[in-house]
Amino acid sequence: METKKQDGYARSRCLYVAEAALEYFISLLVTGAYLAKITSAIGMSDMLTGILTSFVSLGFGFQIIAVFLANKRPVKRWVTLLHCLNQMAFALIYFIPLVHLSHEMKIFLFIAFLLTGHILNNVVNSPKINWFMSLVEDKRRGSF
């Protein structure tokens, strides 16, 4: 009778898939039509919305920061912290229309949360992927 070898990463893979799905859902909520709806709800002009959405294309510049942060140091702690802050910044965008603040303060908070979220996303994404990939043996990658 053959016994199955215990898979130590089964739970981690399930949690990774759940985290990736949540991250994807949040990323959808801060782009396209959803972003346009939020900006119109807080009274931002279309011109300012266009400028902010083009900021995403500058993300490669912030990925360079990750090289210096991840250089020869453990990434688990700071990647987890920055990734949580990144997702929190994106999620907080949706509470701005619900808060009773001045028009200018709502726009300021929106810009601060959006830019912070995108900057942190670009800083943390590459080291996070490298860390997650290092948890899986080379010959087992790609199979769930």
Describe the function of each predicted region.
Residues 46-47, 136-144:
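Loop-to-transmembrane helix entry/capping segments in MFS-fold secondary transporters
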Residues 1-70, 76-80, 86-94:
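Helix-loop boundary and gating motifs at the non-cytosolic
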Residues 23-27, 119, 129:
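A short, ordered amphipathic alpha-helix with a cationic face
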Residues 121-136:
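Intracellular juxtamembrane helix-capping segments at the cytosolic ends
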Residues 29, 72-73, 99-103, 135, ...:
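Membrane-interface elements of multi-pass transporters and channels
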Residues 21, 82, 89-96, 102-124:
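Hydrophobic core of transmembrane alpha-helices in multi-pass small-molecule transporters
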Residues 66-70, 132, 141:
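Hydrophobic/aromatic and small-residue hotspots that mark the transmembrane alpha-helices
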